[in-house]
């Protein structure tokens, strides 16, 4: 029985090594890696963290400009500020969507930000 388990564990380890080598080969050859492709867990987590940080900075970055909308001296200036705020918000939403394709939810990312687990 243990011999069967040993072979099974060995096959799983070999498969894992093959997957990792295939991943590294793709990186070396500069082949595009899609979100559903296999990648090491640490790589996926780091990628999600980086994308989430960028998304958070886009969303948080629109807030100071938003405060100036009511203080803008002309309608033309208000329109410019509104466009900038909308642009920042859109960038944040695109980035949250990119993180979602990697297997996390927008709610998880925002909750982590609010709880101080992510910056």
Regions found by a protein language model. Give the residues of each.
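Non-heme di-metal
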Residues: 2-119
């Amino acid at each position: 029985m243990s011999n069967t388990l040993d072979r099974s564990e060995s096959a799983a380890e070999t498969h894992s090594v093959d997957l990792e080598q295939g991943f590294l080969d793709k990186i070396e050859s500069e082949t595009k890696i899609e979100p559903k492709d296999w990648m090491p867990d640490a790589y996926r987590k780091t990628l999600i963290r980086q994308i989430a940080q960028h998304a958070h900075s886009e969303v948080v970055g629109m807030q100071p400009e938003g405060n100036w909308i009511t203080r803008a001296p002309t309608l033309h200036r208000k329109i410019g500020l509104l466009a900038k705020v909308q642009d920042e918000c859109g960038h944040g939403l695109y980035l949250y969507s990119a993180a979602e394709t990697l297997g996390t939810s927008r709610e998880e990312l925002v909750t982590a930000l609010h709880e101080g687990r992510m910056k």
